Amino acid sequence: MNVVIAFPSAFANTHGLAKAIKRAIPALTSVIIEDSCLVCESTDAVEHASRMTKLFGIDRVAIAKKVSSRFSDLCAEIAKVGTKIVMPGHSFYIRTIIQQSARHDYVSRDVEFAASGMLTARLAAIKAHPAKSEKDAQDFILVVVGQKWAYVCIQMSNAPGGIVAGSQGSVLASIHGPLSLLSCLNAAKGGFELVIMLPYFDEEDLKRNTALAQVFVTKTGTRKQKILATPINVREKGTIALFLREMIISEILNSHSNYNRIVLPLNIAVHPLWMIDLVIREAVSAKKTPFAPLLFMSEELISYAQVVGIQEQEILSETIQAKEDFFRKYSRIIEYEAKVAIKRTKRLDLEVGPNYLHDVIDSI
């Protein structure tokens, strides 16, 4: 029988993660906490492992074969699995993790030594051989020994890490460009459940921003989403328009009384310092707790964006070079447009499906 094993990230609460996995994948037969990992029995290990790689709070995900923890049986099963995953001419390494709660009359090194010997004999014809260390190995076999059963990992995948989604409560954020999308992804990785404000100038802007929101739900594996669709009006063009958009959106975030925490897509390399000071001061003045996940990123911001599929030029296009007197000149317009936008806001509660883009646009 194949199972899915989730290895929690360093700061994840194991019991909270178990609940999050059950909510995200209700089709799982069971979720068992085995000290340093969670073993999930599944009727479709491949599909459920794929979905688990999108969950925050998980560092790695493995599809594993559930086997007997008896020493002789375990070593034989490791060798059997190894013949299927070790490539001809490759070096391999077997690593065994025995959970603290497991009670067996052998230690990790016993399993690794015996199983390596058996596997070497079986793979002699294809000239595969054991490596001296995990670092030197071309193929790696991880074995987890639990309280009752052992698990031989067949396939390993990376997951996003971070803190269990929703464990830090909810936060209000806006998606209206690459920076705001990256801010939302970082906030989600920090354990927040996001209510998304989706501001837009016109139909084309709505399509662009909804496409970015779709990236968010895809990357985070979101199944249900709250959206505040908010039409905004900016008459100016160029740099002034960028500045006014950010200030109006910040004002709207500050004005929503149902949310005490907000995410601000501020970055020291993209926004002038006076603007960052102003936006944060106004948020605090409005009795909000502002979070700015990208604030001090520079070169690493570009690298992170590229991982998500955002190009460097898209980030640079959001650079604002407005002068401080712009705010004094446009402050009344910002306040007025924010009030109008809030009155025209439409709340959506969505079940995220394959037609997400059309579902959002049609609902608005």
Model segments located where?
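Nucleotide-activated chemistry modules centered on ATP-dependent adenylation/adenylyltransferase
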Residues: M1-T53, R122-K132, D136-I364
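Short, hydrophobic/π-rich interface segment
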Residues: Q100-A131
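Short, contiguous clusters of charged residues that form electrostatic/catalytic patches at enzyme active sites
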Residues: A76, F113, G117, L182, ...
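Accessory substrate-recognition/RNA-binding modules or partner subunits associated with SAM-dependent
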Residues: A10-E112
